[in-house]
């Protein structure tokens, strides 16, 4: 509840559960993306069916095991539905699923959204991030180079917020590119289990 502009009145917001939320996650950051969806769904009184990437089912197993341990009689509020494309399609077509939240490529969204909308379902799509940096003449170029590099190469570039392009003011373009090339040359790319790899 919150105050109203009208004297002696208050405004009240009520969240109405919508039912079952289907959550389709990609291979990268599978637990984080599920957690965001789960928190939003559950705080509004909804259950969730999680269809993880076939490349990250171990993460789903671990989360489900923890959930079952702490959920008591509410274990069924989180279900895990493993599989690939066929299972994702089935989840999208199921009229019992009120909302499908999917994270992945733009192509995946183009294929799944029509399946949900054909039954007048709801979608929440996080697809194909395409991020840019705008670098102004007043920028601290040493700091900017580090930020741009981390945004483009951090976590091997496998995240939706990965930097794909930079717009650099012409007055600083040459200096920025020299610093960027020099910084990239210091990156140690290698086996991810090797602590010296970046």
Where are these regions (language model features)?
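ALDH superfamily catalytic-core signature
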Residues: 69-70, 107-198
